[in-house]
Curated annotation (Swiss-Prot):
A zinc finger (RING-type) spans 10-60. This is E3 ubiquitin-protein ligase Midline-1. Residues 320-379 form the COS domain. Has E3 ubiquitin ligase activity towards IGBP1, promoting its monoubiquitination, which results in deprotection of the catalytic subunit of protein phosphatase PP2A, and its subsequent degradation by polyubiquitination. One of its GO terms (molecular function) is zinc ion binding. Keywords: Coiled coil, Cytoplasm, Cytoskeleton, Metal-binding, Microtubule, Phosphoprotein, Repeat, Transferase, Ubl conjugation pathway, Zinc, Zinc-finger. It comes from Mus spretus (Western Mediterranean mouse). Zn(2+) 1 binds at residues 119, 122, 142, 145. It catalyses: S-ubiquitinyl-[E2 ubiquitin-conjugating enzyme]-L-cysteine + [acceptor protein]-L-lysine = [E2 ubiquitin-conjugating enzyme]-L-cysteine + N(6)-ubiquitinyl-[acceptor protein]-L-lysine. Transmembrane segments: none annotated.
Length: 667
């Protein structure tokens, strides 16, 4: 039935054909729909009868009309009969095919007239009845709100006002350009709902259109996707909001705790000040009492001496008035002795008096304490420490790091972090990656020695100063361990070689005493060799060999399994740089490659990178690269030396030179 109904549907109104016209192209069209097409082609004040042609909406064939116009076209009576029978066979009810569009229009008008439409803009409760619905705004207004929102001036004069419509979505089903037409397609170009007339004869006829179902599915899918994202984002925001609220609560609790702590600490300071005030005040009172008591005693003594002296002075003055010589002589001697005794005794009775002890030297100076009180503030994280690279020391497996801090008194502890440095580009990434660092916590001093490091390796160090308020880290400092130190092994030396100078020098010595045979000793007549006393199986190592006049020697490395009766480099288990008078070669597995070092090569540097499989030789004094063996080392290797004349001296345990301590760029 649905397939049959689609065949009986008008391409313009999308309803069952009513009074169908049979077009010359064999398609059918409602009479009223054909008339609307002609009306849409008319210019202003132009009669419909003046239009003599139009296009079939189905096949776009041009239909030419006679003088009779649409009446000149035949009625499709057969099709009308089929439609009538189809309507009778269908189930009657709302929206059924048997229900004509006039009946549905009547029912819609009845429903519209019966249903009350309220103003959607009113602030009143309840809202007033709407008098108009603005199709442009898609809002129904009462008279008062309409006047307030749609004054008689542009752009509001262009708004389309219609009678109030109960449901706002109904107005979206009607075409804005053709008021009596329902929208049944979507203009993709203008992103707008349109009717069939808009596509046939309107401004959308050359636009890209799509079926409503297609656009519906696409927009619905897009809306669902956006809605999912919005819901997800909203959930994230709700989680964030909960965390923000929790953070606010923590701020409130912590602030209250800190305020209470501040009051408690200030009360303690005030209590200490009051205690010190009482103690110092007591000292002042005691000092005052002691001084006043001493001064009172001195005053009493002075008064007593003055009283005694006054009586004696009176008697002496009375005696001096005596004119009778005999009487004067009788009393003068006694008085003179008493005056002399009183003068002498006054010096004894009157103690030494310090008139400067007026308590003015008792000074109070709280300027330092005042400055400290003025600086009272909440605790902040300590300043970043500074690594003192010039004070740091290293061995082949340890590094001692020294640092300083501007505010040591506020630091509770230090934390030392370190990791292997693999290139300048990785410093930032390493600083941001906590997993890459070895950490030594709870250091109380300004230095620390790290043990168990790889020899000949550069490390990055950072020091973190910590207190209750937080922590701050120093700038990264780069320090490196020295190479593995070693000496020559006398037990491995050929019997015609002499090892001396603390086993650091080897020289040809025909007069050497007979040495006992050992498995590790070089024995061949031409292989005058000696090995180092270490076997290296990891890390980077650098040592130098001083050429002391020798013109025939070989310097290199060998596996423990290398034959002791062959020259180094003559087998697959050894690698060597050799000089035979004026011929310079590098040799491995009996293959020789000539090289051209400086004419007077005095010191050879050897850089072994075991993990990356390289053995490099350098002119150590001139920092010139000579040659590099690239080899995957499978066993521990031992430094090995051969000398046929004069002597060689080794210098080991050196740090790798800076110009070599990077990714090598070989010529």
């Amino acid at each position: 039935m649905e397939t049959l109904e689609s065949e009986l549907t008008c391409p313009i109104c999308l309803e069952l054909l009513e009074d169908p016209l049979l077009l010359p192209c064999a398609h059918s069209l409602c009479f009223n729909c054909a008339h609307r097409i002609l009306v849409s082609h008319c210019a202003t004040n132009e009669p419909v009868e003046s239009i003599n042609a139009f296009q079939c909406p189905t096949c776009r064939h041009v239909i030419t009309l006679s003088q009779r116009g649409l009446d000149g076209l035949k009625r499709n009576v057969t099709l009308q009969n089929i439609i009538d029978r189809f309507q009778k066979a269908s189930v009657s009810g709302p929206n059924s095919p048997s229900e004509t569009r006039r009946e549905r229009a009547f029912d819609a008008n009845t429903m519209s007239s019966a249903e009350k439409v309220l103003c959607q803009f009113c602030d009143q409760d309840p809202a007033q009845d709407a008098v108009k619905t603005c199709v442009t705004c898609e809002v129904s207004y009462c008279d008062e709100c309409l006047k307030a929102t749609h004054p008689n001036k542009k752009p509001f004069t262009g708004h389309r006002l219609i009678e109030p419509i109960p449901d706002s979505h109904i107005r979206g089903l009607m075409c804005l350009e053709h008021e009596d037409e329902k929208v049944n397609m979507y203009c993709v170009t203008d992103d707008q709902l349109i009717c069939a007339l808009c596509k046939l004869v309107g401004r959308h006829r050359d636009h890209q259109v799509a079926a409503l179902s297609e656009r519906y599915d696409k927009l619905k899918q897009n809306l669902e996707s956006n809605l999912t994202n919005l819901i997800k984002r909203n959930t994230e925001l709700e989680t964030l909001l909960a965390k923000l609220i929790q953070t606010c609560q923590h701020v409130e609790v912590n602030a209250s705790r800190q305020e209470a702590k501040l009051t408690e600490e200030c009360d303690l300071l005030i209590e200490i000040i009051q205690q010190r005030r009482q103690i110092i005040g007591t000292k002042i009172k005691e000092g005052k009492v002691i001084r006043l008591r001493k001064l009172a005693q001195q005053i009493a003594n002075c008064k007593q001496c003055i009283e005694r002296s006054a009586s004696l002075i009176s008697q002496a003055e009375h005696s001096l008035k005596e004119n009778d010589h005999a009487r004067f002589l009788q009393t003068a001697k006694n008085i003179t002795e008493r005056v002399s005794m009183a003068t002498a005794s006054s010096q004894v009775l009157i103690p030494e008096i310090n008139l400067n002890d007026t308590f003015d030297t008792f000074a109070l100076d709280f300027s330092r304490e005042k400055k400290l009180l003025e600086c009272l503030d909440y605790l902040t994280a300590p300043n970043p420490p500074t690594i003192r690279e010039e004070l740091c020391t290293a061995s082949y497996d340890t590094i001692t790091v020294h640092w300083t801090s501007d505010d040591e008194f506020s630091v509770v502890s230090y934390e030392l972090q370190y990791t292997i440095f693999t290139g300048q580009a990785n410093v930032v990434s390493l600083c941001n990656s906590a997993d890459s660092w070895m950490i030594v916590p709870n250091i109380k001093q300004n230095h620390y020695t790290v043990h168990g490091l790889q020899s000949g390796t550069k490390y990055i160090f950072m020091v973190k100063a910590i207190n209750q308020a937080g922590s701050r880290s120093s700038e990264p400092g780069k320090l490196k361990t020295n190479s593995q130190p070693f000496k020559l092994d006398p037990k491995s030396a050929h019997r015609k070689l002499k090892v001396s100078h603390d086993n650091l020098t080897v020289e040809r010595d025909e007069s050497s005493s007979k040495k006992s045979h050992t498995p590790e000793r070089f024995t061949s007549q031409g292989s005058y060799g000696v090995a180092g006393n270490v076997f290296i199986d990891s890390g980077r190592h650098y040592w130098e060999v001083v050429i002391s006049g020798s013109t025939w020697y070989a310097i290199g490395l060998a596996y423990k399994s290398a034959p002791k009766h062959e020259w180094i480099g003559k087998n697959s288990a050894s690698w060597a740089l050799c000089r035979c008078n004026n011929n310079w070669v590098v040799r491995h597995n009996s293959k020789e490659i000539p090289i051209e070092p400086a004419p007077h090569l005095r010191r050879v540097g050897i850089l072994l990178d075991y993990d990356n499989g390289s053995i490099a030789f350098y002119d150590a004094l001139n920092s010139i690269h000579l040659y590099t063996f690239d080899v995957a080392l499978a066993q521990p290797v031992c430094p090995t030396f051969t000398v046929w004349n004069k002597c060689l001296t080794i210098i080991t345990g050196l740090p790798i030179p800076d110009h070599l301590d990077c990714t090598e760029q070989l010529p």
